[in-house]
């Protein structure tokens, strides 16, 4: 007897994938909320008047680094809501650090709303995304979300160094910092 694979939306395999997608959506939403709370603490630890600090002439300013968080979350919301464009149309960097923080809050809310309203099956759909230097491929939405969150974590670490270099107090991130001991 020949074995066939069903691609019907009522097949057990499809139902299992849909259940897994729902679990992935919840896991991502939980981690996203925790990481964004921490990122906002790092952003607001930058001392007043230091948004144009850059540690090296080839480095971005603190304002430019902090604006990367909103760009990534804009991509997350677009991927979730089927508004993905490649190449992306990035908005200009906000003119003030207060505007950067406001954009961070707005894009956090947009992603949280998209996570709450997007069918979990969307996570398994693909969109074009870079996979290496001058390399593109179709990448699952869930993988884009994790990539962008990890990119945000990377830039949060970068910004925490700027906070330290400008005399700010670095908040605890995954454990105590020199400025926020736990004991």
Locate predicted features:
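Acidic catalytic patch
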Residues: 117-134
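Short, solvent-exposed, charged loop/turn and helix-capping segments
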Residues: 46-49, 120-121
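A generic structural signal for well-ordered alpha-helical segments enriched in polar/charged residues
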Residues: 37, 41-45, 106-113, 117, ...
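Active-site rim elements
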Residues: 22-29, 97-101, 145-149
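Helix-adjacent hinge/juxtasegments
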Residues: 78-119
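Short, contiguous alpha-helical
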Residues: 2-11, 29, 33-43, 50-90, ...
């Amino acid at each position: 007897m020949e074995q066939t694979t069903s691609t019907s939306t009522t097949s057990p395999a499809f139902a299992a994938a849909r259940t897994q997608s729902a679990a992935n959506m919840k896991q991502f939403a939980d981690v996203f909320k925790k990481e964004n709370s921490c990122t906002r603490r790092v952003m607001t630890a930058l001392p007043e008047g230091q948004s144009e600090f850059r540690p090296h002439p080839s480095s971005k300013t603190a304002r430019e680094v902090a604006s990367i968080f909103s760009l990534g979350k804009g991509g997350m919301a677009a991927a979730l809501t089927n508004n993905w464009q490649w190449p992306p149309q990035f908005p200009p960097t906000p003119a003030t650090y207060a505007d950067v923080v406001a954009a961070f809050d707005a894009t956090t809310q947009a992603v949280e709303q998209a996570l709450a309203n997007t069918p979990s099956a969307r996570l398994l759909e693909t969109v074009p995304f870079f996979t290496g230097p001058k390399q593109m491929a179709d990448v699952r939405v869930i993988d884009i979300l994790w990539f962008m969150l990890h990119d945000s974590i990377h830039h949060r670490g970068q910004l925490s160094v700027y906070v330290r270099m400008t005399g700010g107090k670095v908040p605890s991130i995954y454990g105590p910092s020199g400025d926020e001991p736990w004991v």
